[in-house]
Amino acid sequence: FGNMLQYTQDDYDYENQAVTFLDNHDVTRFGYTQRSQKTYNAALATLLTSRGVPNIYYGTEQYVVPADGSDVSGRIFMQTDSSFDTDTTAYKLIGKLSELRQQNDAIAYGTTTIRYSNDDVLIYERKFYDDVILVAINRQPDKAYTIDNVETLLPEGEYVDFLGGMLNGENISVYASTGINTTASITLDGGEVGVWQYDAAASTPEIGNVVSTMGRAGNRVYIYGDGLDGNISVKFGETEATVESNTANEIVTYVPDNAVAGYNDITVTKGDAVSNLFTYNVLSGDQNQVIFHVKAETSYGENIYIVGNVPELGSWDPDKCTEALLNPNYPEWFLPVSVPAGTEIQFKFIKKDANGTVTWESGDNRVITS
């Protein structure tokens, strides 16, 4: 799980926008497969503090256990099939960690660093600017672990478990050390979870997320983060955008009419301070869908892509081409692509191998009108 958090952080363009869940209406309820409440609570704490947007399936807070493992059995009618108790640990845990998500931007927007991992224990850290959260989880309900000298970006000092011992977490001490601070030994009893946090005031505009990440001129865009209040300006690349409204945590703006089509870095400027960059894909106009098809032989590790003369196809740059085509009936490949409507489009199919080596389709450019 720790490895997955790390590689998706590198592989996903917008990893903090991924919706995460323990269960849903299409799968077996988590309470059916995991009967230990200690492990159940540890999983819930992980869901609510790891990267992504957590999706809580109704009844999770009540430890619902259906009659069998089918997805249908899990779709209970709460009013008749379950009592509703606001004193369950799961209910209180969801509320407490949702509060932390609102309070500390490291959960919603932060990067992830794995500080310790074995088959039962995972310690990870989330960081966004100077906001830091350290989470230690023991999923094994009947075995304790002691981890010495855990590295952390938490400043030196004493830290209280944010959950107040709800999952038996204890307070920790962080000591200054050469290179990076470390904690004293952390002992985790069976099923124990500890959450420690440092919430810093924003000194510059900080972009945490943008919704959506793609649009055409005139589309409304929401920028989320911290330090976004006051007299600010927003740019898409080098083009300034109109700001409709702004607060400390949200800006409402629009894609500028003269923004350059393709990938633009959004920035927020406040006085002399400029925010971090956030990539936004400016479309070249109204869109429609074209499904591209090709019959092509490939070697192991090769995939087929499309590159063409419009920004949506990379403007002839193979590094900005489409995603790989699909091939459920190899050697037939296809891919639905959003392209500018009513436009003559020139394109080619290309092959890329695992090393990124590109082989261009021979012959004249293919031409369609969308």
Language model: regions and residue ranges:
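Beta-strand/beta-sandwich contexts
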Residues: 201-230, 273-286
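Alpha-amylase-like alpha-glycosidases and glucanotransferases acting on alpha-linked glucans and related
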Residues: 1-53, 58, 62, 69, ...
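Aromatic- and carboxylate-lined catalytic core of secreted/periplasmic carbohydrate-active enzymes
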Residues: 6-9, 74-119
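Carbohydrate-binding surface patches
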Residues: 115-153, 256
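Surface-exposed, short loops/turns at beta-strand junctions within beta-sandwich domains
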Residues: 257-262, 339-343
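Aromatic-rich carbohydrate-binding modules that target alpha-glucans
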Residues: 297-344, 352-369
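Short proline/glycine-enriched turn/loop motifs at strand-loop junctions of beta-rich domains
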Residues: 142, 152-157, 225-232, 297-302, ...
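C-terminal beta-strand-rich structural cap/linker in extracellular carbohydrate-active enzymes
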Residues: 174-204
